[in-house]
Regions:
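RNA-interacting cores
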Residues: 1-199
């Protein structure tokens, strides 16, 4: 069972929670899912931003989030039928990287065309094909924050929007549940989908 939630924070909530960067938001989301017997992270989230008055964060999880001290949260179960469609519109914020075969180091993917090609090439491993003409790449940039006084983290970011066709249901479900790409604990990898009826 998967649960979809929306956390809404107003300006006063963000100030009280001291959300100043991506790590501040990471800390708030993690507080909604206390550790249970050392089990690994079982949730994903995506910061949808908002207007001057309200910020919205989408959350996908295997358990219900705690009631937050600040803000409002709305949760509902995702019906199994929702994940049995063949075609979806999608949006996903990804930390796009590639691993060097020799050094095993990861390097960021740069440039809109390279990002476009990278996503299409990776899609089959995630269980779907992308309609190439539908794929848009936006919000290309870098997210940086101080995790503590001595550690600064930097992640490349890009948002991909388009249409997909499921070609391997098990892989698709696994990547919907666990997210795609790296840095999923920092708001990357949540595949936001809407079914599309094909005639």
């Amino acid at each position: 069972m998967m649960i979809a939630s929306v956390l809404r924070l107003n300006r006063a909530d963000c100030k009280s929670l001291e959300i100043k960067d991506a790590y501040g938001l990471h800390r708030v989301i993690y507080s909604l899912f206390p550790e249970q017997d050392g089990r690994s992270r079982d949730f994903l989230y995506a910061d949808k931003g908002g207007d001057w008055n309200c910020r919205q964060i989408l959350i996908l999880s295997e358990r219900r989030p705690e009631i937050p001290e600040f803000g409002e949260i709305e949760s509902k179960k995702i019906p199994e039928s929702f994940l049995q469609w063949d075609n979806y519109g999608f949006e996903v914020i990804v930390n796009p990287t590639q691993r060097n075969g020799l050094s095993k180091k990861t390097t960021p993917i740069k440039g809109r065309e390279n990002l476009h090609n990278w996503f299409i090439q990776k899609a089959s491993a995630w269980g779907f094909d992308v309609e190439q003409d539908s794929l848009q790449v936006s919000n290309i940039g870098v997210v940086s924050f101080d995790r503590d006084k001595s550690i600064k983290q930097t992640h490349g970011t890009a948002t991909f929007i388009g249409k997909l066709k499921v070609i391997h249901r098990e892989a698709f479900l696994n990547n919907f549940k666990h997210g795609i790409g790296r840095a999923k604990g920092f708001g990357f990898g949540l595949l936001q989908i809407v079914p599309i009826q094909k005639y």
